[in-house]
């Protein structure tokens, strides 16, 4: 039987990394206890740090975990991790994350972690690794690892640690200082180069303006002169004269003169009367001219203000038109009701019923009064609305006078017009209708 048995171990909190390749359990006998070591622990040291190794801060490469112990024999589990040359940084990241997870579970269960890993591999064997880790918690920490491996076997490592509230590593401070110095040196060199370029090319500009005005003709002339000079051995002068604006201003606008023709006549009386009329005309013309000069020129309205005024006027027009249209619509509805009342009023059978029955007469008069009040309540400024309203009110009042006449002792304010149809005609029509009915009954009996 062999002394080495292979099995896989799984961490209950974190899964095992891919770099862990083999494990073995050794059950030593009493013969091998005297020897110092019987296991070949050849581990590839990729980083080649001088002792003490900085990787010892995270965890030793080989761990001995005691499984079982008895007075007769001891059993130990030997975990052997072989680091492949292709994944050194991955192993380091896994070990750091393992330690951080265990530490965060004990200290601060709520902690945010961020990891960034970049890897560049070239065909000649050159490799570059960059690893950054940020931990947010009560103590914010930041780790950075940069590794460069060239094909010839040269290796470069940079390890920086930042802890807020604590101290930074000396290497990180030195690197930051060097970077700042390099940036300052570059900025100074760029500024000096720009100064040299500017010295070679210098430009100066002169701007002059001349304004001339002639009051006699009312013309104003503007001349602009631009002078540009460039530094160095060669200097050039450019003069440009442009007359851009010629504004003709008139001091006063001459008013149109009125010509008055005077006809001389022989008669003195006519001359005296015409002379007075001429004097009055001159006085009125002078007065109109003085008023115009006091008012001044007609100021042009800006487009925005003009647009606002137009909108206001149009809105007022729309409001007036909508009111008049609403009034006309109400009058049309009232006119349909008036046609119904008119048809029933001109029906002789219904008129005889009104004359006999007081309740029906009261109902008909109430209808007329309601329609009269509705027509009277309609308001409108338009001429059409007022004319239609007046004609309908007059007709309804006349119908009401016939159906329900008022007593003679009424006041002048409550006076209404009488209907044009006298009562005698109604009585004659009633008598004729009665005779016709009697004749019809007699013919049926025969």
From Swiss-Prot:
Q: Which residues form the BAG domain?
A: 330-407
Its localization reads: Endoplasmic reticulum
* GO MF assignments: calmodulin binding
Which terms are listed as keywords in the entry?
Apoptosis, Calmodulin-binding, Chaperone, Endoplasmic reticulum, Phosphoprotein, Stress response
Description of the deletion phenotype = Susceptibility to heat and cold stress.
Domain annotation IQ: ranges:
303-332
Q: Name one GO biological process term.
A: protein folding
Single GO cellular component term: plasmodesma
Keyword Transferase appears in the UniProt entry = no
Q: Which residues carry this modification: Phosphothreonine?
A: 443
Q: Where is the composition biased (Basic and acidic residues)?
A: 239-250
Instruction: Fetch the InterPro entries from UniProt.
Output: BAG5/6/7/8 (IPR040400)
Task: Give positions of region: Disordered.
Answer: 230-252
Lineage, top-rank taxon, reads Eukaryota
Keyword Isomerase belongs to the record: no
Q: How does it assemble?
A: Binds to the ATPase domain of HSP70/HSC70 chaperones. Interacts with HSP70-11/BIP2.
Q: What does this protein do?
A: Co-chaperone that regulates diverse cellular pathways, such as programmed cell death and stress responses. Necessary for the proper maintenance of the unfolded protein response (UPR) during heat and cold tolerance.
Q: What is known of its domains?
A: IQ domain mediates interaction with calmodulin.
Can you name this protein?
Answer: BAG family molecular chaperone regulator 7
Say which species the protein is native to.
Arabidopsis thaliana
């Amino acid at each position: 039987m062999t002394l080495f048995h292979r099995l896989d171990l799984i961490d209950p909190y974190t899964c095992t990394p891919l770099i862990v390749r083999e494990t073995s359990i050794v059950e030593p006998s009493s013969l091998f206890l005297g020897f110092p070591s019987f296991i070949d622990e050849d581990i590839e040291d990729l980083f080649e740090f001088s002792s003490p190794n900085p990787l010892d801060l995270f965890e030793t490469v080989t761990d001995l975990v005691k499984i079982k112990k008895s007075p007769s024999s001891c059993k130990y589990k030997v975990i052997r991790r072989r680091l492949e040359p292709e994944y050194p940084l991955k192993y380091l990241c896994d070990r750091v994350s393992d330690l951080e997870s265990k530490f965060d579970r004990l200290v601060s269960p709520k902690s945010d972690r961020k990891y960034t890993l970049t890897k560049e591999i070239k065909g000649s064997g050159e490799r570059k690794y960059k690893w950054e880790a940020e931990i947010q918690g009560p103590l914010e920490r930041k780790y950075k690892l940069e590794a460069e491996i060239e094909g010839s076997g040269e290796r470069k490592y940079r390890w920086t640690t930042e802890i807020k509230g604590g101290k930074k590593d000396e290497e990180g401070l030195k690197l930051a200082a060097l970077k700042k110095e390099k940036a300052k040196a570059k900025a100074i060199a760029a500024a000096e180069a720009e100064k040299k370029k500017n010295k070679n090319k210098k430009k100066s500009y002169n701007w002059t303006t001349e304004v001339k005005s002639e009051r006699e003709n009312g013309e104003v002339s503007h001349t602009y002169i631009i002078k540009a000079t460039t530094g160095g051995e060669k200097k050039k002068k450019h003069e440009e004269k442009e007359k851009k604006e010629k504004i003709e201003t008139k001091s006063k606008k001459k008013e149109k003169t009125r010509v008055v023709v005077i006809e001389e006549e022989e008669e003195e009386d006519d001359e005296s009367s015409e002379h007075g009329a001429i004097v009055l005309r001159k006085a009125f013309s002078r007065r109109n001219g003085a008023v115009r000069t006091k008012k001044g020129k007609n100021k042009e309205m800006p487009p925005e203000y003009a647009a606002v005024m137009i909108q206001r006027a149009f809105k007022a027009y729309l409001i007036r038109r909508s009111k008049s249209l609403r009034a006309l619509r109400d009058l049309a509805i009232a006119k349909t009701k008036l046609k119904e009342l008119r048809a029933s009023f001109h029906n002789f059978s219904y008129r005889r019923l009104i004359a006999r029955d007081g309740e029906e007469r009261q109902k008909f008069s109430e209808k007329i009064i309601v329609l009269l009040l509705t027509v009277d309540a309609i308001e409108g400024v338009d001429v059409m609305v007022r004319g239609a309203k007046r004609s309908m009110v007059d007709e309804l009042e006349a119908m009401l006078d016939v159906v329900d006449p008022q007593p003679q002792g009424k006041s002048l304010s409550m006076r209404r017009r009488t209907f044009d149809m006298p009562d005698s005609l109604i009585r004659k029509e009633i008598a004729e209708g009665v005779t016709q009915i009697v004749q019809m009954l007699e013919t049926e009996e025969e």
